[in-house]
């Protein structure tokens, strides 16, 4: 006979189990949402990276001495110390979260093969001649490099050489696999994202029409294709050919990709056309539709100048003349003329996009912003005190300041004009290829000239200053409106939109001078306008009725020591701003510009550290900045 205590215990256990089962079956939908962070995909983190970096696999980088491997490029980006091509130890102040190595697709890998004297190079007499020049070094190597580049520019390279390094060849396929496999090796979802990409380097007649291509996908899809080139017979310099390549990639692989351009400032007006294209085509409905689809992002700042605005186009903006390159096109074969500027700068392109959308139904210049280095040293360095130059030939030395980047009979891009810039901040919920790509595509990004300040920008109809005091302002931002890159639609009322913006300094950089909102709009008569508003300023300065502060923040830079102090400016700024000039019948865009207090440029560090003798024209001090992607308002 069973013990009564055992029976009782078993019975009690059964009752409890049944009760627990009943309770479990009564779990409601509200219960399932108890944990506030479960299933949350709100972008709470900003991930920093360089979307434009070259290794020695790029023709120009390799010819001018870049021997730093693609693997070392990733190691530096991830925080390791490596040596530059000249043997100088280099390390980033902080690791990056992601990187896109974008080697030029044209003649990819040829420079290293010529220098190494591979069998296929030695079999072609002219290529063997170049190899011998590099082998001798010094003047002979320089002459070989310029002779090769000259033949490339004039399209007079040996046909067999072009064939060897074009899509479909064994050599081209080998180099592409090297690039893809390196990205696969260094990609660690959640820790570091290594995108697969390349640069399509269209430069007809010296007009810079370059685009970088980024793939969302892994090697299994990337290796089903080969990059598009610009050299005939397989390549093309027409962006329409690139759009077709992207279309084919997505159709044939099931993957996703997009392109983004850079350095409109070196295109002599052809980067953002409004009527005709350089190739003789027209800016018609097909063109604007394709460009809107395939180019959702723009590299607004980098080593070859800042591309936000120009004082000729924005004469009332005292911050527009920042790191401006104004001499000519990329090879200075044609001088710059004022009428070209309209097709070169991002702010003007945003404005022209509103007009084209009204005319043709699509806005081809509806892009988000990012920054990049475009370094050809394999070194993704963007800090003023850690500047390793555009190419290996201008790595740190006291004389590099005097070496022009490009020169011709028409002028020169002087060495001191190079810019230690920039990086892209991406708002995403995790550090993976998919999450970062999607954020770039939806334009939830911002570009900086190097510093990693935190910037949030939301637009809606009901923000108030109390929203900034919430324990999670971003949650309120998403709930009541749209983030940077988003769209506001026309309301029935005449209520003006409000914008919640806040910025925090980079903890390793300078305090903030101000936050500005830049607005562009298309009025009812078809005219374009722009206006700059100071919306939050440091040090208790006053913003007057015109929306501007008349008092400068000051300058603490010591020119003798290349130092500054954070005794001016604020560590963070925030506000909720309502457009005082809003008309619901006028389409518009808004973006923020966050400006630091003055700090030394890299040339001043060269003077203090290396004893460089600076030209009197060299700017010693600048105000670094961030540009948020715009928020658009449609009056349709």
Question: Where in the sequence are the language-model features?
Answer:
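C-terminal functional module detector
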Residues: 25-70, 74-131, 165-168, 178-190, ...
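Gram-negative bacterial Sec-dependent N-terminal signal peptides
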Residues: 1-23
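Aromatic/His-enriched, Gly/Pro-containing loop or helix-boundary segments
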Residues: 78, 136-141, 231-236
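Aromatic- and acidic-residue-enriched carbohydrate-binding clefts of CAZyme catalytic domains
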Residues: 125-162
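Blade-edge beta-strand/turn elements of extracellular beta-propeller
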Residues: 223-225
């Amino acid at each position: 006979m069973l013990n009564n205590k055992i029976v009782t215990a078993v019975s009690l256990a059964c009752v409890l189990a049944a009760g627990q089962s009943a309770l479990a079956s009564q779990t409601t939908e509200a219960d399932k949402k108890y944990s506030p962070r479960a299933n949350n995909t709100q972008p709470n983190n900003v991930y920093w990276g360089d979307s434009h970096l070259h290794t020695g696999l790029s023709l120009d980088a390799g010819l001018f001495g870049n021997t730093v491997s693609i693997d070392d490029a990733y190691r530096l980006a991830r925080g390791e110390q490596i040596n530059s091509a000249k043997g100088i130890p280099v390390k980033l102040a902080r690791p990056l979260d992601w990187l896109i190595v974008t080697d030029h697709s044209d003649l990819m890998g040829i420079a290293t093969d010529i220098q190494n004297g591979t069998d296929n190079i030695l079999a072609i007499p002219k290529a063997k001649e170049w190899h011998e020049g590099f082998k001798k070094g010094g003047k002979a190597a320089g002459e070989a490099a310029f002779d090769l580049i000259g033949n490339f520019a004039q399209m007079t390279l040996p046909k067999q050489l072009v064939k060897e390094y074009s899509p479909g060849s064994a050599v081209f396929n080998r180099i592409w696999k090297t690039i893809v496999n390196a990205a696969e090796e260094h990609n660690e979802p959640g820790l570091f994202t290594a995108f697969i990409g390349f640069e399509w380097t269209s430069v007809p007649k010296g007009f810079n029409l370059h685009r970088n291509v980024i793939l969302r996908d892994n090697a299994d899809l990337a290796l089903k294709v080969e990059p598009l080139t610009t050299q005939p017979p397989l390549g093309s310099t027409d962006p329409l050919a690139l759009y077709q390549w992207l279309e084919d990639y997505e159709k044939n692989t099931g993957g996703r990709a997009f392109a983004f351009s850079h350095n409109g400032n070196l295109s002599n007006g052809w980067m953002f056309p409004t009527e005709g294209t350089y190739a003789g085509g027209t800016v018609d409905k097909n063109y604007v539709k394709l460009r809107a689809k395939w180019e959702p992002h723009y590299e607004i700042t980098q080593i070859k100048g800042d591309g936000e605005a120009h004082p000729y186009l924005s004469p009332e903006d005292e911050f527009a003349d920042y790191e401006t390159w104004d001499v000519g096109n990329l090879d200075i074969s044609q001088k710059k003329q004022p009428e070209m500027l309209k097709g070169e700068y991002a702010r003007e392109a945003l404005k022209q996009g509103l007009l084209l959308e009204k005319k043709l139904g699509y806005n081809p210049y509806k892009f988000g912003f990012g920054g990049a280095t475009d370094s050809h040293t394999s070194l993704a360095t963007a800090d003023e005190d850690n500047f390793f130059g555009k190419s290996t030939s201008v790595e740190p030395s006291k004389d590099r300041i005097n070496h022009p980047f490009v020169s011709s009979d028409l002028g020169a891009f002087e060495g001191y004009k190079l810019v230690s810039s920039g990086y892209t901040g991406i708002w995403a919920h995790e550090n993976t290829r998919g999450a970062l790509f999607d954020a770039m595509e939806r334009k939830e990004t911002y570009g900086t000239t190097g510093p990693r300040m935190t910037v949030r920008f939301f637009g809606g109809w009901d923000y108030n200053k109390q929203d900034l005091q919430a324990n999670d302002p971003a949650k309120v931002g998403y709930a009541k409106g749209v983030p940077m890159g988003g769209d506001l639609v026309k309301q029935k009322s005449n209520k003006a939109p409000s914008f919640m913006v806040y910025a925090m300094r980079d903890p390793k950089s300078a305090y903030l001078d101000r936050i500005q909102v830049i607005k562009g709009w298309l009025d009812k008569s078809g005219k374009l306008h722009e206006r700059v508003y100071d919306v939050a300023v440091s040090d208790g300065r006053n913003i007057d009725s015109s929306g501007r502060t008349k008092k400068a923040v000051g300058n603490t830079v010591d020119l003798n020591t290349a130092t500054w102090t954070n005794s001016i400016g604020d560590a963070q700024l925030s506000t909720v701003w309502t457009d005082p000039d809003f008309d619901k019948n006028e389409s518009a865009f808004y973006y923020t510009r966050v400006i630091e207090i003055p700090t030394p440029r890299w040339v001043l560090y060269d003077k203090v550290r290396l004893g460089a003798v600076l030209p009197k024209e060299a700017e010693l001090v600048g105000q670094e900045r961030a540009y948020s992607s715009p928020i658009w308002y449609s009056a349709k």
